[in-house]
C-alpha cells in the first residue's frame, strides 16, 4: 500500500473530533496533528490519547514545525480560516475548509469533486448543501437535453440541539450559500434553500425535501434512475444517507407555477463516531470532507508513486 497523506486537523470542537475518528479509519489519510486554542479542550485530549501530536497554540505553531502536513482540515470559523488560508498556501499545504469562509471552490463529491482535485483550497459548502445538492444534480443531468431544471427548492430539517451558536447566528448565510450551490453545483437555473431547526425531543435525524421543476415531457424513469445512482454514490461515504420513498412526480399545476415537479425525500443518519446519530447534518459534513481528502490523496500519491 502506498504511504498515506499526512493530515492536520485545525479546530478541536465537536466537528473536528468526529472528523478525527473518520480519518483514523482511512486507508489514504493519516491524522498526525490536532490544533486548537483551548488547552482544556476535550477534542485535544481525545486526540492525544489516540496518538496525535496536539497543541493549543494555534495555526502558527503548526506552520512553525519542520514536518508539515500534506493536508489541513479546518473546522474553526470563517474568520479564522480566511486568515490562515494564505499561510497554508504559502507553505504548500492543501486545505479542506469546513467553515463558511469559501476561500476556494465549493465541492459536493458526486457532482463536482473531479473538477477540483487540483485546487489548493476547497470548501465543503453547508450540511444542507451536501445532503440535497446531489439530488438536484441527479435531476439536472437527467433532463439536460430538455433545457435542465428551471427551479429547485430544498428544505433541510435538522435537530435543534445539533445546531450550535455558529449555525444559529448564520442562518441567512446558510440559506444564501446553499441556494447558490443548488444553482452553480446542482445545475438549477434558480435555487432556494430553507432550513428548519426541529425542536422535537427526542431529537429527529436530518430530513430533507428536494423539489425540482422539470420539463413536462421528461423521461421520469431516467430521472428516478439518476437519483438512485447518486444516492448510491453518497452512501459510499455516508452509509446513513437514504431515500425515504421513491421520487414523487406531479403534473403541472397552479401551485407549481405551471411546471411538472419531482419531489425527493431523503434522511441522513450519522455514523455515531463522536456525534450522536441524529446529528446527520454534521456527520455528512465530516464524511464528505473525508471523501474529498481521500480523493485528493489518492491522486497525489498516484502521481508521486506513493512518495511524499
Curated annotation (Swiss-Prot):
The active site is at residue 127. SMART domains: Semialdhyde_dh (SM00859). NAD(+) binds at residues 12-15, 162-170, 281. NCBIfam families: ac_ald_DH_ac, PRK08300.1. It holds the Pfam family AcetDehyd-dimer. It catalyses: acetaldehyde + NAD(+) + CoA = acetyl-CoA + NADH + H(+). The keyword Membrane does not apply. The keyword NAD applies. Belongs to the acetaldehyde dehydrogenase family. This is Acetaldehyde dehydrogenase 2. GO terms for molecular function: acetaldehyde dehydrogenase (acetylating) activity; NAD binding. GO terms for biological process: catabolic process. InterPro entries: Acetaldehyde_dehydrogenase, Acetylaldehyde_DH_C, NAD(P)-bd_dom_sf, Semialdehyde_DH_NAD-bd. The lineage of its organism: Bacteria, Bacillati, Actinomycetota, Actinomycetes, Mycobacteriales.
